[in-house]
Amino acid sequence: MQFKHKGLIIILSSPSGTGKSSLAKELLKIDNNLRLSISVTTRKPRLGEVDGINYYFKTDLEFKTLVKQNKFLEYAKIYNDYYGTPKEYVKMLLKQGLDVLFDIDWQGVRSIKKNTNNVVTIFVLPPSLEILEQRLRNRATDNEETIKLRMQSAQHEISYANEYDYVVINDDFGQTLKKIHEIIVAERAKNFSYHAH
């Protein structure tokens, strides 16, 4: 009889500016059983982004065709662009016993939980809204209007935090990374299957 780890879907959500992308990047470095789910998007590539590595970039029409063909695990419109998670790619990774890390919002969490098992959801909170605003200003990539929008959006997203399995406050990057990794390791221990030969 062979015991085997069943692949998990691990979802990391947080308001913009909470350090979620950096946390995801570090988790992938320290855990070789994790793979990042690559989203399909209609937004324009940013400087340095590569098609098939950061995102799969598609036109509106291509995206809508994929929706019609039921190719997404979940999809949502965020600001003015569409984002979706390709079903086949995720299935392939899970089948290999790999865990798939998602960087999506509460809407995505709801639809994935509806359609899939073995989902672990983690919400990353800033220490406070004041600190979040400070972080957004320090990035110096957004104008006043965008910062206002992001702060409103952050308050809205935080109101859904209680729907998540875990909530972690990112007041110290190293400690937060450690906490999230411990959650993943513990969840793996609850999730295995065995095959009789």
Curated annotation (Swiss-Prot):
Q: Which UniProt keywords apply?
A: ATP-binding, Cytoplasm, Kinase, Nucleotide-binding, Transferase
Domain of life, per lineage: Bacteria
Q: Which GO terms describe its cellular component?
A: cytosol
Q: Does the keyword Kinase apply?
A: yes
Q: Which reaction does it catalyse?
A: GMP + ATP = GDP + ADP
Question: Main role?
Answer: Essential for recycling GMP and indirectly, cGMP.
Name it.
Answer: Guanylate kinase
Q: What gene does this protein come from?
A: gmk
Protein localization: Cytoplasm
Name the InterPro entries on file: GK/Ca_channel_bsu (IPR008145), Guanylate_kin-like_dom (IPR008144), Guanylate_kinase (IPR017665), Guanylate_kinase_CS (IPR020590), P-loop_NTPase (IPR027417)
Q: Its Gene Ontology molecular function terms? A: ATP binding; guanylate kinase activity
